[in-house]
Amino acid sequence: MSNVPAELKYSKEHEWLRKEADGTYTVGITEHAQELLGDMVFVDLPEVGATVEAGADCAVAESVKAASDIYAPISGEIVAVNEELNDSPELVNSDPYSDGWIFKIKASDEAQVAALLDATAYEALLEDE
């Protein structure tokens, strides 16, 4: 079973979301998603300053197996991207919940966060797959 940290929120598309002290949210893909994709070779990051809608594709993770869209779990403005992934995309594999984060977003609608899955609901989703 994949590691599913209890303090995070999750999307059905296997992105995770963590609220930061400054009120922004850090987003990445889950351990389950990176296991399915395999070894990352490139991450196409979103543009800082871009406004995205919840559910819209905003980045791409390319692995040795496939290229997979990464979706914004909430609407808002991209305020930072993980530049480390340009040289070390494998961080998504080795540390998906920390050093392998993909972007940070400033929410335009906090209510969307509450609508995401908690760890228990995400684990149930994984069991159904």
Swiss-Prot record:
Keyword Iron-sulfur: no
Residues annotated as transmembrane: none
CDD domains: GCS_H
GO biological process: glycine decarboxylation via glycine cleavage system
Names of required cofactors: (R)-lipoate
Tagged with keyword Transmembrane helix: no
UniProt KW keywords: Lipoyl
Gene3D superfamilies to which the protein is assigned, alphabetical: 2.40.50.100
Lipoyl-binding domain ranges (all copies): 24-106
Family annotation (NCBIfam families): gcvH, PRK01202.1
Assigned protein family: Belongs to the GcvH family.
Entry function: The glycine cleavage system catalyzes the degradation of glycine. The H protein shuttles the methylamine group of glycine from the P protein to the T protein.
Protein name (record): Glycine cleavage system H protein
Higher taxonomy: Bacteria, Pseudomonadati, Pseudomonadota, Gammaproteobacteria, Enterobacterales
The gene coding this protein: gcvH
